[in-house]
């Protein structure tokens, strides 16, 4: 379990065994069942979650009751409500489990303590955050400028493991199209 977290970190910074144990001491571990909420809109969202096993989605429910999926997170990915996490405010997003899920999570306070104590981890989190901003920009530009088919093709190219693990209704919601439109694309 810890090995996956270490591999994730060491793609960016190298850690000795002692350093990794120190890093790990700032994280906690939790298991969730399928359909269980990790975060609910309106509640505190003090944790950033690293997925060891399972699949989650973050989504927003608008005033009309429509779900808008912002992100999926599977093994070796991170998920949180960034606004609530960094600003220590109530969550705007919901995060729930699409499969039984295992996560390591770190509170914003523990993250700040870790970064203050260890420059390598400050660099790691900076690089992780930058990658998240880049992915968000790519997603926004995709929604603004690509056709439904182009968005679907990009989704399957960027995340080839996800279509087999997700119902088409969730993929359609993520792409900002109806389930019927996704079916008309004649995708498999």
Write out the residue ranges for each language-model feature.
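Cyclic nucleotide-binding regulatory module and flanking cytosolic helices
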Residues: 1-28
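Amphipathic, Lys/Arg- and hydrophobic-enriched alpha-helical face
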Residues: 9, 32-39
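Localized chelating/binding microdomains
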Residues: 14-15, 30, 48, 102, ...
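Residues that recognize and position ribonucleotide moieties
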Residues: 30, 49, 71, 96, ...
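Cyclic nucleotide-binding regulatory domains
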Residues: 37-98
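A small-molecule sensor/coupling module
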Residues: 91, 110-147, 151
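Phosphate-/nucleic-acid-contacting segments
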Residues: 146-188
């Amino acid at each position: 379990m810890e090995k996956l977290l270490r591999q994730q970190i060491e793609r960016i910074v190298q850690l000795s065994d002692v350093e990794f144990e120190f890093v790990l001491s700032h994280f906690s571990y939790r298991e969730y069942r399928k359909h269980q909420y990790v975060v609910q809109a309106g509640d505190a969202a003090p944790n950033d979650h690293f997925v060891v096993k399972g699949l989650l989605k973050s989504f927003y429910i608008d005033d009309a009751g429509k779900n808008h999926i912002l992100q999926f997170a599977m093994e070796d990915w991170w998920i949180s409500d960034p606004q609530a996490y960094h600003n220590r405010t109530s969550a705007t997003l919901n995060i729930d489990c699409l499969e039984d899920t295992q996560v390591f999570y770190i509170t914003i306070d523990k993250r700040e303590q870790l970064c203050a104590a260890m420059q390598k981890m400050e660099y790691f989190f900076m690089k992780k955050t930058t990658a998240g901003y880049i992915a968000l920009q790519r997603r926004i530009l995709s929604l603004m400028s690509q056709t439904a088919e182009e968005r679907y093709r990009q989704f399957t190219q960027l995340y080839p493991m996800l279509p087999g693990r997700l119902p088409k209704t969730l993929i359609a919601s993520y792409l900002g199209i109806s389930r019927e439109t996704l079916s008309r694309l004649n995708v498999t």
